Amino acid sequence: MGHNSSWVSPNTSHPRNTSGAEAGANLSAFGELSEAQLYRQFTTTVQVVIFIGSLLGNFMVLWSTCRTTVFKSVTNRFIKNLACSGICASVVCVPFDIILSSSPHCCWWIYTMLFCKVLKFLHKVFCSVTVLSFPAIALDRYYSVLYPLERKISDAKSRELVMYIWAHAVVASVPVFAVTNVADIYAMSTCTEVWSNSLGHLVYVLIYNVTTVIVPVAVVFLFLILIRRALSASQKKKVIIAALRTPQNTISIPYASQREAELHATLLSMVTVFILCSVPYATLVVYQTVLNVPNTSVFLLLTAIWLPKVSLLANPVLFLTVNKSVRKCLVGTLVQLHHRYSRRNVVSTGSGVAEPSLEPSMRSGSQLLEMFHIGQQQIFKPSEDEEESEAKYLGSADFQAKEVLTSCPEGEQEPPQLAPSVPPPGTVDSEPRVSPVAPMESGIFPDKYSLQFGFGPFELPPQWLSETRNSKKRLLPPLGNTPEELIQTKVPRVNRVERKMSRNNKVSIFPKVDS
């Protein structure tokens, strides 16, 4: 990627006061030099924007193809191949041309012959892969439209086609090591200062541009024309095919769906932008190779450097904007990132210790728990009958005492300290006395959930309370008032005997016999 003598104006001497004609010529030369320097700064700025935008855009294309299943696996593979070649071309081609465009005499290590040849080889490879990916996508679109119910290109064939693309690019780029002053589409700098006018150089330039640039672009337009003819013929004949690819309600569908039509428009736009941006490159090749013009204009050279690189930025932008499904996926991802970032800001800016009077969802600081709690309140909202039973429940103190007994699990029941109870004679109180789980006051309870041993989203719904057990509106059978009683189900006893009382107050045990 050596120094190109045409980048620097040869007229760099200061004007002399020899004559008026020479002074005018020197002033005009300085004016041209200042314009060239200004245009050089413009090209450097544009290439920096292209470098950043192409990297971000191609990475987003890779992410969208991996995240969504909008297209088939074969189409996704070709699109990923195009995005990878765009990333490689942006990383390898653009930075060094930015350096040489800003200052041709900087970075002496770039001008070493070995380093320059390796970079030119990589430039050729990635440029060739980008161009050869267009006909591969067009071929896949052609088979998808003409044979929608068949799979002409399998996954194995698509992998082989991608391997052929890279092999073709490598073989077409190997002669760069022998011909050092070759310029490609994405990098116009050369490794030698003087252009060689040998026959081998002319043959290589013609063969490369015909086989790697002109023929692939012509194949793309040929496939697009065939697709258009097939679609127009299907619309005229009103062909109705089974809705296997895009199901609809018994409506005649064309060969290509809206999603495929968007992909066709994307491919056509990419190829059109590539052709328009490559016009300065083709002009420069004709000037330096065919017409053998050694001194070309600085403006033509700088334009041939930055304008073809616009296609590196245009390819991902067109893919992300023209396709509606990909655009929706991208917008949804941005919305998710915004929500996640805003949620983190709310949690980080909140106080470390919450007030005890706040709700559990607000104390936790999690929006997920808050949404769950609100949804639970809406689901288990008490009805009018339940509100009446709640009023009766709050007005009866005896009923509250019974509710305390029934709300505690077995083995943990303790009668309320309302009055000392005396056990009947001849009985032994074998149940252990355990203090309740939560201290309870003898006053009126604040709400109907105060007797339940739950917290937050684990509070029991009103349909499971004892006053509504006989109602038809309950959701589940009354297995208990606490989660422990819900889990502990009683196993029915087998071969239970019957006890009958006789006239002499004697208990007789009769075994139960199956009749």
UniProtKB/Swiss-Prot annotation:
Q: List the SUPFAM superfamilies hit by this protein, alphabetically.
A: Family A G protein-coupled receptor-like
**Entry-listed glycosylation sites:** N4, N11, N17, N26
**CDD domains membership:** 7tmA_GPR176
Q: Could you tell me the membrane topology recorded for this protein? A: Multi-pass membrane protein
- Where is the chain membrane-spanning? 42-64, 78-98, 109-129, 158-177, 205-225, 265-285, 302-322
Concerning PROSITE patterns, the annotation shows:
G_PROTEIN_RECEP_F1_2
Organ and tissue specificity = Expressed mainly in the brain, with prominent expression in the SCN (at protein level).
Q: Which InterPro entries match?
A: GPCR_176_Rhodpsn_7TM, GPCR_Rhodpsn, GPCR_Rhodpsn_7TM
Give the protein family. Belongs to the G-protein coupled receptor 1 family.
Q: What does this protein do?
A: Orphan receptor involved in normal circadian rhythm behavior. Acts through the G-protein subclass G(z)-alpha and has an agonist-independent basal activity to repress cAMP production.
Name the UniProt record assigns to this protein: G-protein coupled receptor 176
